[in-house]
Structure formats: C-alpha cells, structure tokens
C-alpha cells in the first residue's frame, strides 16, 4: 500500500522508485488496471458508461440503485487506484449531470461511503484528482507499441467525445515528456553531493530539453481538443465544491459526515512535475501562490508529495551554483529557468484560448446552460486563473541568476 503523506527520511542517493515514480513512465501509473474483481461490477458497469448515462440524464437514477459494497476485496494498490478513479468519475457525473445550475448536493451513502474509504486508504481526497483523470486513466491499444496518441485510449470518460480523449491523453504525453527531466533532477542532486560539475552540467542540459519537450507535448492540445467543447461540455465535470460559486457550501457525503465537505476540482497544479522542477531549481513563488500550490499537494499520491518535500530539504542547487561562481553550470541553470518560464507562458496562452476566449464566445451565443459561467474566471481547482498563472511565471523568471553573481 502507498505510504501516507508525511515525508520520508531523505536518503542518498535519491531514487525515483522509492517514491513510486517509474523510470519509464514518471508519475504515470505504469500499465493501469482496466477491471476490478467481480464484486465491484456495479461500480464499473456505471463508470464505463458515463458519457451515455450523463447525456441521457440517467446517471443519478443508476447511482441511487447502486448497492453499498464492501471495500475489503480490493487487495492491491492498483485495484485501489482504479476503484478511486471509477468512484471519483461517477461522483463528478452524479453531481454535475444537470450542469452547474442544478448540482446534486448530497452524495448517496452507497457511493459516498466506499469512495471515502478508498480515498483514506490511498491518502487522496474523495473527489476526482489529476492522478485519476490522467495518471491512472490510460492504456495502450497495442501493448508493444509506443506511448503516443494513436496508440493510447482512456479507460473512463465523460461527455466530450474526441476532445475529452485528446485532453486526457495529451496530458498523459506531457507527463511522459517529463520523465527525462525527473531522471536529470535525480542525477543533478547526486552531482551536487559528489561535487561533480560535469555531471551537474549534463543533468541541467537534460532538464532543459525535457522542459522544452513538455511544451511541445502541450502544444498537441490544439490538435486534439476543441476549445468550445472543452469549455461548454468537459470543464464542468472537472469542477469541485470548494471556492465554487455553484456549490458554495460544499457536498454532503451521506453516511460519512453530516456537514458538507469542500474539495477543490481538478487542476494542472495537482501534477507533481512542475512542483518537482520548482523545488530543484529553487524557484520561490509569492505567498498566495504558494498557499494554493501546497494545498494541491494534498491532492497528489502521498509518495509523490513526499518526493517534493524531500526535494525541498535537499541541498540547494542555487546555493551550489552561486558558490561555484560564473561558468557553464550557471548558464545551464538559467537556460532551465528560461525554458520553464516559456512553458508557463505557453500554458497561459492555452488557458486563454480554452477558457477565456471560449467563455466570451459562449456568452455571445447566449449559452447560459450548460456552460459553467460561475467558473469563467476561475480554474476548476478554484483559483483566479490568469493572475495566478502570471504570478507563477513572473516568479519563475525572477529566479534567473546574474552571471556575475
């Protein structure tokens, strides 16, 4: 079972595998399961039919008929991850089936009780998170084939058709593009420990290339995702019930708590990738941004959060480079920071196209329902998007070191 959220004791040399991070797939769960034991057939029968059930306004009726199942037959970590993804997806569909104007405010006990139990076992919140939608939600059509869009499929889906498929799978490719960067990060930490300038330079160069590959992977969003479908159809199913005007008091998890609970919706900030790069490069964000970013770490698998916490207390790359003086490593460090700033600028452009511009078009067409207008200027995670993203980018660029430092 996955370790809980406290940071592990930092051991050297740093090892990705110790934090359930794959040498081949990074934070992606390698070869996710697609089926649960037969006992959980009622869950999977609903989860695998979500687009049809939601579009035909039948999901809530199916959930109300769903039996209360015991979670003890979920034996493995991978089964727990699939169960969490299935129950999370059913929950999002159940809450938002009728759009933001008529959210369901009470989650039935047959869904709420097992969902909360599985969530506690995994150290995750009982809501759809990045590790559900992306890290656990992919499979290869040809197991021997490459990890690329044409050979990938999602396991669980929502309304949105090919655009939703593209949104999820392009994000899978973004996670995969980060793998060489994660390896470089570990190599760089060891180089600092060994005082090896040559190895550190090689690691920084590889990190820069990985960040640039992430930007190129993200650019595929424009090829596979229609902005109007993302905004008007998909986005509501990623929305949470914290800092959301459509659900100001939260969601009641029947049989778990009498008071409503509040959880943030999906957010790119729930991906551990840029958190890891920020920690390694020593990039410090403003107080408001740090508060949100660190809260999003509670929405990550605990071992991934522990990895970030251990990076934070590891020897400082910036201090090492500053102590070493001007040279190739300082130049390579700055190139990594610049590449990360460019990635964040590109992400701002993507957000502007898929949310800001799409919201304007939806208003001009008079689409008041089902477009999530209460969320127009906020991310599905509950942040004021553009101001947050621009602040994060600005603080990234402020990390550049003067060659004469």
From Swiss-Prot:
GO terms for cellular component: cytoplasm. It comes from the Eukaryota. One of its GO terms (biological process) is immune system process. GO terms for molecular function: heme binding; indoleamine 2,3-dioxygenase activity; metal ion binding; tryptophan 2,3-dioxygenase activity. Its cofactor is heme. Its EC number is 1.13.11.-. Disruption phenotype: Knockout mice have no apparent defects in embryonic development or hematopoietic differentiation and have wild-type profiles for kynurenine in blood serum and for immune cells in spleen, lymph nodes, peritoneum, thymus and bone marrow. Knockout mice exhibit defects in IDO-mediated T-cell regulation and inflammatory responses. They exhibit defects in allergic or autoimmune responses. Pfam families: IDO. Keywords: Dioxygenase, Heme, Immunity, Iron, Metal-binding, Oxidoreductase, Tryptophan catabolism. Pathway: Amino-acid degradation; L-tryptophan degradation via kynurenine pathway; L-kynurenine from L-tryptophan: step 1/2. Catalyzes the first and rate-limiting step in the kynurenine pathway of tryptophan catabolism. Involved in immune regulation. Activity is inhibited by D-1MT (1-methyl-D-tryptophan) and MTH-trp (methylthiohydantoin-DL-tryptophan) but not L-1MT (1-methyl-L-tryptophan). Belongs to the indoleamine 2,3-dioxygenase family. Gene3D superfamilies: 1.20.58.480. Ido1 and Ido2 are 2 distinct enzymes which catalyze the same reaction. Ido2 Km for tryptophan is much higher than that of Ido1. Ido2 may play a role as a negative regulator of Ido1 by competing for heme-binding with Ido1. Low efficiency Ido2 enzymes have been conserved throughout vertebrate evolution, whereas higher efficiency Ido1 enzymes are dispensable in many lower vertebrate lineages. Ido1 may have arisen by gene duplication of a more ancient proto-IDO gene before the divergence of marsupial and eutherian (placental) mammals. Expressed mainly in antigen-presenting immune cells, liver, kidney, brain, and placenta. Highly expressed in kidney, followed by epididymis and liver (at protein level). Detected in the tails of the spermatozoa in the testis and in the kidney tubules (at protein level). Constitutively expressed in brain. This is Indoleamine 2,3-dioxygenase 2. It is an enzyme of class 1 (oxidoreductase). It catalyses: L-tryptophan + O2 = N-formyl-L-kynurenine.
């Amino acid at each position: 079972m996955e370790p809980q959220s406290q940071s592990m004791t930092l051991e050297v040399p740093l090892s990705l595998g110790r934090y359930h991070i794959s040498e081949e797939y990074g934070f992606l769960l390698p070869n996710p399961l697609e089926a649960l034991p037969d006992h959980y057939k009622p869950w999977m029968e609903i989860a695998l039919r979500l687009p049809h059930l939601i579009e035909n306004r039948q999901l809530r009726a199916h959930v109300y008929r769903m039996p209360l199942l015991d979670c003890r037959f979920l034996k493995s970590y991978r089964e727990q991850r699939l169960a969490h993804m299935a129950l999370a997806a059913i929950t999002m569909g159940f809450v938002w089936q009728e759009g933001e104007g008529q959210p369901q405010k009470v989650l039935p006990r047959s869904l709420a009780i097992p969902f909360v139990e599985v969530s506690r076992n995994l150290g995750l919140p009982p809501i759809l998170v990045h590790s559900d939608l992306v890290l656990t939600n992919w499979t290869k059509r040809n197991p021997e084939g490459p990890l690329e869009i044409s050979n990938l499929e999602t396991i669980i889906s929502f309304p949105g058709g090919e655009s939703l498929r593209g949104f999820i799978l392009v994000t899978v490719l973004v996670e995969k593009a980060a793998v060489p960067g994660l390896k470089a990060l570990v190599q760089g930490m060891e180089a600092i420990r060994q005082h090896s300038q040559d190895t550190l330079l090689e690691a920084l160069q590889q990190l820069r290339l990985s960040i640039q590959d992430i930007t190129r992977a993200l650019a595929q969003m424009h090829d596979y995702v229609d902005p109007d479908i993302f905004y008007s159809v998909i986005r509501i199913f990623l929305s949470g019930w914290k800092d959301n005007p459509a659900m100001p008091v939260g969601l009641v998890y029947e049989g778990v708590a009498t008071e409503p609970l509040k959880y943030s919706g999906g957010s790119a900030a729930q991906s551990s990738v840029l958190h890891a790069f920020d920690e390694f490069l020593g990039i410090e964000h403003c107080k408001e941004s740090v508060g949100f970013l660190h809260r999003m770490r509670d929405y990550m698998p605990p071992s991934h959060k522990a990895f970030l916490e251990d990076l934070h207390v590891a020897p400082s790359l910036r201090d090492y480079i500053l102590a070493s003086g001007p040279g190739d490593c300082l130049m390579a460090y700055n190139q990594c920071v610049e590449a990360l700033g460019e990635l964040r600028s590109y992400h701002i452009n993507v957000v502007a196209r898929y949310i800001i511009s799409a919201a304007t078009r939806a208003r001009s067409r008079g689409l008041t329902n089902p477009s999530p207008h209460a969320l127009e200027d906020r991310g599905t995670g509950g942040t004021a998007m553009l101001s947050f993203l621009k602040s994060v980018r600005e603080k990234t660029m402020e990390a550049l070191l003067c060659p004469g430092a």
